[in-house]
Amino acid sequence: MIKKRSILIVTRKSPLALWQAEFVKQQIENSHPHLACQILGCTTQGDRLTTEKLVDSGGKDLFVKDLQKALLNRDADIAVHSIKDMSACDGPELMVGAFIRREDPRDVLIVKGELSTLPPHAVIGTSSPRRQCQLKKFQPGCKIKEIRGNVGTRLAKLDAGHYEAIVLAAAGLKRLGLENRIHYYFDPHEFIPAIGQGAIGVECRSDDHEMQTLLKSLDHRETRLCVTAERAVNEKLGGDCFTPIAAHAIIKNDQLSLFAMLGKIDGRVIIRATEIGNSEEAKRIGFKVASQLLEQGGDSLLRELKQ
């Protein structure tokens, strides 16, 4: 019996992260029967910070850096990430070898009772400056309250009465079989999702050409192009997880439409921009949308946000 070559996949230990890693594992093994994948769970620095605000501790990169360290130390062959947790640019030693076909990118509202009875001054849980900014436009009288933890933890806090509603990503709920908890889907053109929301990225070392070739069979072209356009917006703006930036791209008939926003956390200022172009020019479209945001006052807004 021929022994199968083992591929080591590193991921976070949350139920959603493990689901994503298992999905990638199955995709690899189905496409390459001579390979066997092993999942290595890692508790990242972001997972260990259960009470502090991410914005005070280094941002979403804290969910990614320990996984990247495992790649660089050659303790793993690939790392599976939620793209929205990753910085706009990869370092020279690492690259995203595959963008898995995107799940539903929308944000959703989960309510403790019924949506129809949600009061105007409801306490809504979110830790995202982007969501806070847009919630203040959607529900001006609402009170935003910080919430941390994985999907299950956040739902438990809602059920325990700490919040009257919370905002989560549709993709995570659907992947975990919790779609029945969703009360309302936000329109992604009005309440713009996070950059890369709903997309899974499989990262490998830049010098591992064998792994890059293997991952090509998993790569979804449309997802890659959409995420490339979205990430280009943030790359040009130089935003981080403290900045209320959002971008969402869709492709139809090889035409890529990109919607983006930049605003203040309190929702009093929201700048929007849209651009349509050939999908193969995804990065150029992203840069153009970012330039439009800057020209509309985004430059001074970013300086103000970084003070």
Swiss-Prot record:
GO terms for cellular component: cytoplasm. Keywords: Porphyrin biosynthesis, Transferase. Pathway: Porphyrin-containing compound metabolism; protoporphyrin-IX biosynthesis; coproporphyrinogen-III from 5-aminolevulinate: step 2/4. It catalyses: 4 porphobilinogen + H2O = hydroxymethylbilane + 4 NH4(+). Tetrapolymerization of the monopyrrole PBG into the hydroxymethylbilane pre-uroporphyrinogen in several discrete steps. PANTHER family: PORPHOBILINOGEN DEAMINASE. This is Porphobilinogen deaminase. The gene is hemC.
